[in-house]
Design a protein with these regions (language model features):
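Active-site gating/metal-coordination segments in enzymes
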Residues: 17, 38-39
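A short alpha/beta connector and helix-capping loop motif
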Residues: 25, 43-75
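Active-site flanking residues adjacent to catalytic metal/cofactor-binding acidic residues
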Residues: 32, 75, 168
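Short, glycine/acidic-enriched loop or turn micro-motifs at the edges of active sites
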Residues: 36, 79, 172
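Early exported N-terminus immediately downstream of N-terminal targeting peptides
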Residues: 71, 76-89
Length: 204
């Protein structure tokens, strides 16, 4: 059996904006799966990078709340016997500690909660209907994990005609290769715009 090994040094840099200003009334912030299972050291599928991005997401949320931007939390949600457990083990079972949003990013009154059973937050949920009812056009997507639920949700957004913005320092990842691949796919295929830092997203 052979192995494929990418030449990392040959990968092209991805274009990234220093700053972006978005219409607060036409924008939603999508926080993907920032749950104890992934972002707390005691979680079953803990990623150190998920804990490291919490402060950047908090900064983004603070500005978004001041401007009354629509805020959406997605929650990976499973029930006993879910087929996904065959690949990832039992995790994010509804109403368990691991299923809950991390304390540092708890939703507030008026925030939207989307429980999803698969990677894409649009799949078999009311997310698209809710966003269209609010006349949302732009999505700022943050959370975990880059090449799985984040990328799947970006794909779902693109397929439904939304413009997607991705603050690079607010995306959790398994390793730098998977992060690059996810961001490459997001920009080259799904036309997402990368922003260097979540702290540099402004709403007006």
């Amino acid at each position: 059996m052979g192995f494929f090994k990418p030449n990392i040094e040959s990968l092209e840099p991805l274009p990234t904006l220093d700053q972006v200003r978005l219409d607060a009334q036409r924008t939603a912030v999508i926080i993907v799966d920032m749950q104890n299972e992934f972002a707390d050291p005691k979680g079953k599928l803990y990623l150190p990078s998920a804990q490291q991005i919490i402060s950047s997401i908090r900064s983004l949320l603070s500005k978004a709340r001041r401007k009354k931007v629509t805020i959406v939390y997605t929650m990976d949600t499973h029930y006993p016997g879910d087929l996904e457990f065959e690949d990832w083990g039992q995790h994010a079972v509804k109403n368990s500690w691991g299923w809950e949003i991390v304390d540092e990013l708890k939703p507030e009154h008026g925030d939207i909660i989307i429980e999803k059973s698969r990677f894409d937050a649009f799949y078999n949920t009311m997310l698209d209907d809710i966003l269209r009812a609010r006349k949302i056009e732009n999505l700022v997507v943050v959370g975990t994990v880059a090449n799985i639920c984040v990328l799947a949700t970006i794909s779902g957004a693109y397929m439904r005609g939304y413009r997607v913005y991705v603050p690079v320092n607010a995306i959790a990842y398994i390793d730098e290769v998977s992060l690059y691949v996810a961001l490459y796919q997001a920009t080259k295929v799904y036309r997402a715009t990368l922003i260097e830092k979540a702290e540099n997203v402004e709403f007006e």
